[in-house]
Amino acid sequence: MSIVTKSIVNADAEARYLSPGELDRIKAFVTGGAARLRIAETLTGSRETIVKQAGDRLFQKRPDIVSPGGNAYGEEMTATCLRDMDYYLRLVTYGVVSGDVTPIEEIGLVGVREMYRSLGTPIEAVAQSVREMKEVASGLMSSDDAAEASAYFDFVIGAMS
C-alpha cells in the first residue's frame, strides 16, 4: 500500500482530513516519483545484465552451489537459480515504484525461508545472490538512485537472513 493510500485510509478511519504531516509525506512521495520510475526503468531495462553478472559473481564466490551435489549444479538447476534471482529483482522494482516494501513482502517473501529450507537450498546463497544483484545494479545508477534502490534490496536480503 502506498503512502498515499495509507494516509487516506488512516484519515478516513478517524473521519478527519489529512494532517499536515501526512500531506508532507505525500508531497515527498510524489516529488520522488520521477526518481523511483527512473530506477525501475534502469532495473527493468538492465535485468538480463544484472542477473547474468550477479549470477557469475555468485558462482565464483560460492562454487559449492554449482559443483556436483550443489543446488545450482547442471544447466537446468543453474537456469532455475537465475530465474529466482530475476524474480527477486522484479520484486525490488515493485518496491521502488511503490516507495514501500509491502508489495515485496506480500507478493514474494512470505514463507521464503521455509520454502528454500524444504528444498535444501542454502538460504545464505539466495541472500548472497540478491547482494550481488544490488552491487551490479548500483553500478548502473547514480549514487542517489543506488542508495534509494539499496533499501529495497536490503529488505529482501534481511528477509532471508
From Swiss-Prot:
It is a peripheral membrane protein. (2R,3E)-phycocyanobilin binds at C81. Keywords: Antenna complex, Bile pigment, Chromophore, Electron transport, Membrane, Methylation, Photosynthesis, Phycobilisome, Thylakoid, Transport. Pfam families: Phycobilisome. GO terms for cellular component: phycobilisome; plasma membrane-derived thylakoid membrane. Contains one covalently linked phycocyanobilin chromophore. Gene3D superfamilies: Phycocyanins. The modification N4-methylasparagine is found at N71. SUPFAM superfamilies: Globin-like. It is found in: Cellular thylakoid membrane. Signal peptide: none annotated. Belongs to the phycobiliprotein family. Heterodimer of an alpha and a beta chain. Light-harvesting photosynthetic bile pigment-protein from the phycobiliprotein complex. Allophycocyanin has a maximum absorption at approximately 650 nanometers. This is Allophycocyanin alpha chain. It comes from Synechocystis sp. (strain PCC 6714) (Aphanocapsa sp. (strain PCC 6714)). The lineage of its organism: Bacteria, Bacillati, Cyanobacteriota, Cyanophyceae, Synechococcales. The gene is apcA.
